[in-house]
Every structure is written in structure tokens, then in C-alpha cells.
Swiss-Prot record:
Protein name: Proteasome subunit beta
InterPro entries, alphabetized: Ntn_hydrolases_N, Proteasome_sua/b, Proteasome_suB-type, PSB_actinobac
Organism: Mycolicibacterium vanbaalenii (strain DSM 7251 / JCM 13017 / BCRC 16820 / KCTC 9966 / NRRL B-24157 / PYR-1) (Mycobacterium vanbaalenii)
Function comment: Component of the proteasome core, a large protease complex with broad specificity involved in protein degradation.
Superkingdom of the source species: Bacteria
Positions of the propeptide removed during maturation: 1-67
Length: 306
């Protein structure tokens, strides 16, 4: 990392007592020491996601990769988040194996959609933000505090969003302060201006395929009884989104590329093994590819069978 003034140290020396004399949570020189992004904004703003840099302005938004689609579902005792792997650049497929779901701390996961470069930096910086706060304050942020921190970061990207480079996260986590462990799963969506909303319906999706994914989850959410069934509904929703949205990638059985997913519960956040996702995706594809319901030899369906 390069600081604006190399002749001055980025941090005061410990011998000066500049930091040690400060109580926890107090700002220093107008900078909130417990917020890494706030510190970065004052010391090296060009390193923040979406910060203007050298080069031509007015770059077409389809000239950079975009990622979609993310889904999240609450289940008894936790929450599940999953994302497809495709990134598009205009009408081209820029990548087929993008990672869009990131574990940001022990009980929080972030899914990203929109301008890929900015969205990935959001997820990484947010993970550092949470770790930085815990180290300085000695305690982890509450879940509402995590929401506010991420909302502030999203709001800081408003200038780039107004130019078309929108990056929207989807936050999911387990609220340790909820007295009812079975209902401690949380899903929070954001808009480009930093506004946020706790999802009470139990599911949410962001990205270009979100309208199709949400329609699928709306029909299947009643089947969610645990993390396993929630994971299956998430895969079904991503499959439906890929079926109608060209920017969303479905399970790629030929290349062995499948969605990624994270399950969060009282024991923390855990990535779902690829073998498990692969098996579930193959089962979904097989169930939707039965010869008696698809293809030129399919038996016509009578009206009374609908």
C-alpha cells in the first residue's frame, strides 16, 4: 500500500501515546479509528472501491464484467446464501467461475452483484472492516452495526453508481443477540444510495436474474424445513434464473462448474462442499430432464392433468 506522504508514518508511533491515550471508539484527527474504511477514506481514498482513478472517463458500463445472481433464504436456525458463477461483459461471457459469495466473519456472509471489480472489493474491504473493528474495540459488531457499516460503504460508491457502475451486496448472517435461535437468521438487501431493508418474507435475491429467482423461491419456500431443503430451493432458484436470464449461469455439467453456497447457523458460517453442490445440481437437472415431460417424444399433457 502506498501512502500519500511517504515522509510521514501512516500510524503514530506507539511511544508517542497518540493512540493509547484515546478511549475506545473515539475519533482521532476527525477519523473514526474503529472504522477501517473511514481511515482509508482519509489516508488513501484512491484505494476505496469505485474511487476515480487515472484514465478516460465515460467508460461504457458493458466494457467491464458484471456478476449475477445471488439468492438467500432463511431456514430454522440459520440462513443459506448461494450464487451463480457467471460474469458477463456486454453480450459476452467474461468468466464462468467467478466467486460471488464471501464469508466476511464467523457469522456473516456477503453476496455481490453488479460491476464485478467494485463488488469484489466491497466484499474484501467489508471483511477487513469487521476484523479491524473487533481488534480495536475488543468486541465484534452487533448485526445491526454490521448492516450500518455496509450501508455506509455502499453509499460511498454512489458517485460511481450514478455513472452506471453499480455494485449491490446482499448481506446474510446469524444474529447472536436474538433470544430465539430458530429465528436468528437475517437477510438484508441494499439499494445504490445505501438504503437497507431487513427481509421478513424469508428470502431475497439480487442481480439481473433476481426477478426469476425470487419467483422460484416464492413457490418453493414452503418446502424449506432445514438448511438442506433451503440449499435445494436455492439451487432450484438459480436454475430458474439461468433458464430465463442470459447473464446468469446455470450448473455447467460439462466443465464441472456449479454454484457456490454458504450455510450460517449457531455454529458459524460454513461453505458447502463442492461435491455436495455438484450432487444436488445433477439431481435437479435430472429431475427437470425426464424424457416423459421434455423433448419431441414427450407425451401431451391433458387439461385434467395440469
Amino acid at each position: 500500500m502506498t501512502w500519500p506522504n511517504r515522509d510521514q508514518p501512516a500510524f503514530p508511533s506507539s511511544s508517542s501515546g497518540a493512540f493509547s491515550a484515546l478511549p475506545q471508539g473515539v475519533s482521532h484527527g476527525g477519523v473514526n479509528l474503529s472504522s477501517f474504511s473511514d481511515f482509508l477514506r482519509h489516508q488513501a481514498p484512491h484505494l476505496l472501491p469505485g474511487a476515480p482513478g487515472p484514465g478516460p472517463t465515460g467508460l461504457p458500463t458493458d466494457a467491464v464484467p458484471h456478476g449475477t445472481t445471488i439468492v438467500a433464504l432463511k431456514c430454522p436456525g440459520g440462513v443459506v446464501m448461494a450464487g451463480d458463477r457467471r460474469a458477463t461483459q456486454g453480450n459476452m461471457i467474461a468468466s464462468r467461475d467467478v466467486q460471488k459469495v464471501y464469508i466476511t466473519d464467523d457469522y456473516t456472509v456477503t453476496g455481490i452483484a453488479g460491476t464485478a471489480a467494485i463488488a469484489v472489493e466491497f466484499a474484501r474491504l467489508y471483511a477487513v472492516e469487521l476484523e479491524h473493528y473487533e481488534k480495536l474495540e475488543g468486541v465484534a459488531l452487533t448485526f445491526p452495526g454490521k448492516v450500518n457499516r455496509l450501508a455506509t460503504m455502499v453509499r460511498g460508491n454512489l458517485g460511481a453508481a450514478l455513472q452506471g457502475f453499480v455494485a449491490l451486496p446482499l448481506l446474510a448472517g446469524y444474529d447472536l443477540d436474538d433470544p430465539n435461535p430458530e429465528a436468528a437468521g437475517r437477510i438484508v438487501s441494499f439499494d445504490a444510495a445505501g438504503g437497507w431493508n431487513f427481509e421478513e418474507e424469508g428470502y431475497q435475491s439480487v442481480g439481473s436474474g433476481s426477478i426469476f429467482a425470487k419467483s422460484s423461491m416464492k413457490k418453493l419456500y414452503s418446502q424449506v424445513t432445514d438448511a438442506e431443503s433451503a440449499l435445494r430451493v436455492a439451487v432450484e432458484a438459480l436454475y430458474d434464473a439461468a433458464d430465463d436470464d442470459s447473464a446468469t449461469g446455470g450448473p455447467d455439467l460439462v466443465r464441472g462448474i456449479f454454484p457456490t453456497a454458504v450455510v450460517i447457523g449457531a455454529d458459524g458460517a460454513h461453505e458447502v462442499p463442492e461435491a455436495k453442490i455438484s450432487s444436488l445440481c445433477r439431481e435437479v437437472v435430472e429431475n427437470r430432464s425426464r424424457t416423459e415431460t421434455f423433448g419431441p417424444d414427450a407425451r401431451p399433457t391433458r387439461g385434467d392433468e395440469l
